[in-house]
Design a protein with these regions (language model features):
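Phosphate-ester processing/binding pockets and catalytic centers
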Residues: 1-299
């Protein structure tokens, strides 16, 4: 008789990672879902039902938010919320803040940094080293969005599959697989969550192209969607951690218990490099009225 291993799955994607000018304060977002295999499958089925009912074939993406799919996107977010609150599903988001400036190594490319961040994200964000010990062992299948760089794909897979050793958890096996987010509604919902955070945090609704007055219809729509997602996350946080205040752009505490890295339903992590300089130029008081960067102000 085959022993039943405790099976978990992680889905993760990244957004706002490319340094397209002008730069934004909050960038390098990583968003992911963790859950037991059966609950992740249940979430997938529920999201797919919504997709079929709305009959919208276009990929779910923050950049695709429109009047036509607004209700569809909100339903997907509601569905994720329901599964987080009622089943074994968790959401994790990590990002960087340019107010904490890291001087890159001379030969370090953007992809190198992205690779290192992905590693940190999977290693620390889901608290997998705190997975309850199962007599039959545990397996974690990590599904990442198919990456552009083959060099980093293989390296990242090797690094991540060695994590149970780093965690001193020989009872855990971890496997990494890559999938195309265009075919994965779960990864697409992560894109919505990250897109909303980046839009809201970087105050895109304040931008006024060519000195126009007021928001464009697209800005109004995106702000409405971002606020909807913000309220959803805030509600989950209040329900599951009993927290009164919620900040989308600060790290979630662990209340003195490191197992909460795994136990919490929702966690946010502002990744601050151990070696950094404070750049006050990126703090809200020093941005212009449209939320744009003006100049460096290193402490």
């Amino acid at each position: 008789l085959e022993k039943k291993v405790a099976k978990y799955q992680i889905f993760a994607d990244e957004a706002w990672t490319h340094s397209t000018p002008p730069p934004n304060r909050y960038h390098c977002f990583f968003g992911g879902i963790l859950g037991s295999e059966s609950d992740v499958d249940r979430l997938q089925t529920a999201l797919t039902k919504i997709k079929l009912r709305h009959n919208i074939t276009q990929e779910v993406k923050w950049s695709n938010v429109s009047l036509k799919n607004k209700d569809y996107y909100k339903e997907l977010i509601d569905c994720l919320k329901f599964h987080i609150l009622n089943h074994d599903i968790k959401y994790r988001q990590m990002f960087r803040d340019r107010a904490y400036h890291h001087d890159a190594e001379p030969d370090e490319t953007e992809l190198d940094i992205q690779f290192k961040l992905y590693y940190q994200y999977i290693k620390n964000m889901f608290g997998c080293k705190h997975i309850p010990v199962d007599a039959n062992g545990s397996s974690i299948l990590v599904r990442l969005d198919g990456h552009s760089s083959e060099k980093h794909k293989t390296r990242l897979k090797d690094f991540l599959e060695n994590l149970p050793r780093m965690w001193s958890r020989p009872d855990i096996t971890l496997n990494v697989t890559y999938e195309n987010s265009a075919n994965s509604i779960r990864l697409q919902v992560c894109d919505l969550m990250m897109g909303a955070a980046g839009y809201y945090g970087n105050k895109f609704h304040l931008r006024r192209p060519n000195g126009k007055r007021g928001m464009t219809a697209k800005q109004k729509l995106k702000l409405e969607m971002a606020k909807y997602i913000y309220e959803t996350i805030k509600y989950i946080d209040a329900q599951t951690r009993g927290s009164k205040a919620f900040n989308w752009f600060e790290s979630t505490g662990i209340s003195g218990d490191s197992t909460n890295h795994f136990a919490h339903k929702l966690r946010i992590w502002k990744f601050i490099p151990s070696v950094h300089r404070i750049n006050k130029g990126w703090q809200n008081d020093n941005l212009d009225k449209e939320g744009r960067f003006v100049k460096d102000l290193f402490e």
